[in-house]
Amino acid sequence: MNERDQVLKAAADLVSAFAGNDREAYFGAFSADASFVFYTLEQPLLSRDAYQVLWDTWRSEDGFEVLACTSSNAFVSLQGDVAIFIHDVATELRMQGEQHFSQERETIVFKKQASGQEQQGLWLACHEHLSAMPEGLPPP
């Protein structure tokens, strides 16, 4: 499998884990030092642990549950051992007993794990940036 296909698979696995509420697989797709920028939060999350704490709070206090998540319009730009993955994402989730639907655009930066690292050769996400979809665009 070429590197572009490896990144596409890593991204598909990440989205699938998110869609399935598979916390272990979802956070396992990110490096420990990953950062996260979500337009719905006032501040960036500067580690995987920080995001996991927030995720667990959402689940315990707000009944957070992902009901569906689909990716479309994927694009990969390889930059050596770094890959930039861009896609449109449609998400359905439940919080505080209410269903929410969102259409967003997301950039995920993947880094190929170097030799000697525990997950050598795997592409792990090291940054995620979620943006609101511009108004007036048709749904995917």
Where are these regions (language model features)?
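Hydrophobic/aromatic beta-strand elements that line small-molecule binding cavities or substrate pockets
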Residues: 14, 55, 71-76, 89-91, ...
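General beta-strand recognition
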Residues: 35-37, 84, 124
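Short, cysteine-centered beta-strand-loop-beta hairpins and adjacent loop/turn segments enriched
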Residues: 92-100
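A solvent-exposed, acidic/Ser-Thr-rich amphipathic alpha-helical stretch
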Residues: 2-5, 23-78, 88, 100
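Flexible, glycine-rich phosphate/dinucleotide-binding loops
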Residues: 36, 45, 92, 116, ...
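Short, low-complexity N-terminal intrinsically disordered segments enriched in polar/charged residues
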Residues: 1-29, 136-140
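Short beta-strand edge/turn micro-motifs at domain boundaries
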Residues: 101-140
